[in-house]
């Protein structure tokens, strides 16, 4: 299994629709100033966070249960900046929609710019033949409020091509998050 380069990522995005919308180069400015970078890097693709957020709240005194998740655990927020409370958690989604080829495993990692501020993005795989917007999970590990910027870089995707095609893909087994759009809550 080998990691794929910027040339491969560009080709797959432009010819196969693997990433849409797609930035063929790393973007560091938005016309008004510096931003957290997004787009194609040497061996990965830095994704942007959309402006839809779900922020954890305890106002309803519910219990967090992955088998029986209560949507009242979150407050919905739309905006260019999301403030995550101290020692709390938020969900968002990528701007980009992904279509992962059958012979590729993609891994989502956090960007060091955010990690150095105590904001951690969950490491998660995008399995062969999965497609959709990626739901992103952010933990604010600090005792202070923390900012997440919409439409700027938030995480990096690494693409690994397998030596052989998998026998059963995410699509084949009817994966529960296949084709997700928007911020998707846990499912069983």
Curated annotation (Swiss-Prot):
Protein keywords: Hydrolase, Nucleotide metabolism, Nucleotide-binding
Residues reported to bind dCTP: 111-116, 135-137, 156, 170, 180
EC numbers on record: 3.5.4.13
Catalytic activity: dCTP + H2O + H(+) = dUTP + NH4(+)
Membrane-spanning parts: none
Subunit structure and binding partners: Homotrimer.
Name of the protein described by the UniProt record: dCTP deaminase
Species whose genome carries this gene: Aromatoleum aromaticum (strain DSM 19018 / LMG 30748 / EbN1)
């Amino acid at each position: 299994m080998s990691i794929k380069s910027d040339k491969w990522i560009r080709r797959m995005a432009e010819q196969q629709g693997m990433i849409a919308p797609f930035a063929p180069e790393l973007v560091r400015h938005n016309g008004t100033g510096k931003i957290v970078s997004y787009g194609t890097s040497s061996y990965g693709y830095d994704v942007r966070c959309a402006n839809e957020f779900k922020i954890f709240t305890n106002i309803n005194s519910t219990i967090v249960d992955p088998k029986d998740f209560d949507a009242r655990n979150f407050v919905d927020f739309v905006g260019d900046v999301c403030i995550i409370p101290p020692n709390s958690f938020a969900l968002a989604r990528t701007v980009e929609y992904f279509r992962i080829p059958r012979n590729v495993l993609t891994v989502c990692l956090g960007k060091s710019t955010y990690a150095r501020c105590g904001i951690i993005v969950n490491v998660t795989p995008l399995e062969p033949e999965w497609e959709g917007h990626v739901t992103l999970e952010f933990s604010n590990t600090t005792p202070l409020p923390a900012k997440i910027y919409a439409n700027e870089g938030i995480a990096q995707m690494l693409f690994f091509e397998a030596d052989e095609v998998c026998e059963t893909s995410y699509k084949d087994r009817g994966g529960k998050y296949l084709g997700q759009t928007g911020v998707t809550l846990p499912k069983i």
